[in-house]
């Protein structure tokens, strides 16, 4: 993963979005 993708996933998790 790129740094941007990793940070985006972290933000989604913080927002309460489940990531498969």
Swiss-Prot record:
Keyword check for Cytoplasm, yes or no.
no
List the signal peptide residues.
none
Question: Its Gene Ontology molecular function terms?
Answer: ATP binding; succinate-CoA ligase (ADP-forming) activity
Kindly report the protein's main subcellular placement as a broad class.
mitochondrion
Q: Which reaction does it catalyse?
A: succinate + ATP + CoA = succinyl-CoA + ADP + phosphate
Naming one, the record's GO cellular component terms include: mitochondrion
Q: Name one GO biological process term.
A: tricarboxylic acid cycle
- Locations listed in the record: Mitochondrion
Give start and end of each ATP-grasp domain: 8-20
Question: What UniProt keywords apply to this chain's record, in alphabetical order?
Answer: ATP-binding, Ligase, Mitochondrion, Nucleotide-binding, Tricarboxylic acid cycle
Q: Which domain of life is it from?
A: Eukaryota
Q: In which pathway does it act?
A: Carbohydrate metabolism; tricarboxylic acid cycle; succinate from succinyl-CoA (ligase route): step 1/1
Annotated EC? 6.2.1.5
Assembly and oligomerization? Heterodimer of an alpha and a beta subunit. The beta subunit determines specificity for ATP. Interacts with ALAS2.
- Give the protein's biological function: ATP-specific succinyl-CoA synthetase functions in the citric acid cycle (TCA), coupling the hydrolysis of succinyl-CoA to the synthesis of ATP and thus represents the only step of substrate-level phosphorylation in the TCA. The beta subunit provides nucleotide specificity of the enzyme and binds the substrate succinate, while the binding sites for coenzyme A and phosphate are found in the alpha subunit.
So what family is this one in? Belongs to the succinate/malate CoA ligase beta subunit family. ATP-specific subunit beta subfamily.
Name of the protein in question: Succinate--CoA ligase [ADP-forming] subunit beta, mitochondrial
Please report the organism this UniProt entry assigns to the protein: Canis lupus familiaris
